[in-house]
Amino acid sequence: MSERYFENREFISLQLTDETIKYFEFIDCTFIDCTVEKCTLTKCRFSECAFVNCHIADVKSDGTEVNYLTFENCILSGINWGLLISSGGFSEPINKLTNCTMKYNFFTDMNLKKFSFKSNGITHTTFADCNLSESKFDGCNLTDTEFFRCDIQKADFRNATGYKVDVITCNIKKARFSVPEVYNLLDSLDIKIE
């Protein structure tokens, strides 16, 4: 099997469903109006690529690494981002999100310090064991999005809605919240307020 290498290329309207993609490397590439669903990425690498108006759903990874990806106006569903961290662990998969919808995603053991999720929709998603200190979630729809064993010190949740933060396992010191959503922090304490 020969490797496939692409640098500074543009891919438009690429449609992939139920495919196994092996040994591809994409550096500084742009994907526009592409759909990738139920695919397995085997030993691929995506570095500093941009995705615009793309739909990526239920993608599985087998030794694939991604770093510094940018997403704009994308729908991202069923992705376990923690499994896509590069082997050196020095960079995170996502560099920037703009006007994206994320649903059923998993972020585990990731350093997302100072990351801006601002004004993106992130629903039914789990953040576990992540460093989210000083991150921005302001204006986000976070319906049924859970935070467990995360550092969210100084994170900004103002005007965010629907989040579930386990205050027992998360460090929330100096995080910013808005009323009435801040009352959601009490959910993990299993108490009643009358």
Language-model segments: residues:
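Tandem repeat scaffolds
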Residues: M1-E194
